[in-house]
Amino acid sequence: MDKKTIYFICTGNSCRSQMAEGWGKEILGEDWNVYSAGIETHGVNPRAIEAMKEVDIDISNHTSDLIDNDILKQSDLVVTLCSDADDNCPILPPNVKKEHWGFEDPAGKEWSEFQRVRDEIKLAIEKFKLR
């Protein structure tokens, strides 16, 4: 069976979508190709890297990428992780499903916010896997 493709999108591909890609590969990797991107690129937030390292997931080699139309078109599911990405997501082909899983942006906030958002994203992906 061919793997399906899930594409996590947020504003800057800096925190939330990077953590979602890390968790997605860890939790869904057997059945899904997992990618992330942003409406813009802000660079991978070092605190997102550190938060994922704390749970033994290495995202230090991830890059902050703009939405790739080829990946977008071949995705089975696009998941927006913030309202900006949800509002500005490109028009999707009819075969691509879209869901919005909103998470607060931890950038510029306390360390505990990175941990909280990281753990919320993990829970959302675990629930998704059970569907």
Swiss-Prot record:
Primary site of residence: cytoplasm
Gene name, Swiss-Prot/TrEMBL: arsC1
Disulfide linkage: C10-C82, C82-C89
Family statement: Belongs to the low molecular weight phosphotyrosine protein phosphatase family. Thioredoxin-coupled ArsC subfamily.
Protein name: Arsenate reductase 1
UniProt keyword Secreted, yes or no: no
GO CC term (a single one): cytoplasm
HAMAP family tied to this protein: Arsenate_reduct
Biological role stated in the UniProt entry: Catalyzes the reduction of arsenate [As(V)] to arsenite [As(III)].
Catalytic activity reported: arsenate + [thioredoxin]-dithiol + H(+) = arsenite + [thioredoxin]-disulfide + H2O
Gene3D superfamilies tied to this protein: 3.40.50.2300
Active site: C10 (nucleophile), C82 (nucleophile), C89 (nucleophile)
